[in-house]
Amino acid sequence: MSGEDLTNLNKIEHIVVLMMENRSFDHLLGYLALEGGRTDVDGLTSDMFNISTNGTVHRIHHLENTTFELDPCHEGNGVDEQISNNNGGFVLNFERMCRPVDPGGVMGYHNAADLPVYDHLAREFTICDRWFSS
């Protein structure tokens, strides 16, 4: 940090961290890289997919509405399955836990038009695209 950077730290009065429970970064803000063209965001890319047990390829896709009826598993074993194989287990876990729903639904995302308040916050403030917690 330069001396000027350290001086500017005195101007900061508050730090607010907004964490969204049970939503992934890609689900809510991944579009910033895909549709928003931001190269500074580790978000979605057009080549992302997961495969279900019957071999169906489920690609990322824009969700039709902002209501997600089912809740993917959040227990330790479920999360382990989801992130195993280079994050390739999301559809498999969702398919197993939420039958008979379309397992590809878990590969959906929202965009700026769906979530204008989040979009505004993401464009005006710092976002943490590599935030991990347990």
Language model regions located:
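N-terminal pro-sequences and low-complexity stem/linker regions of secreted or lumenal proteins
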Residues: 1-134
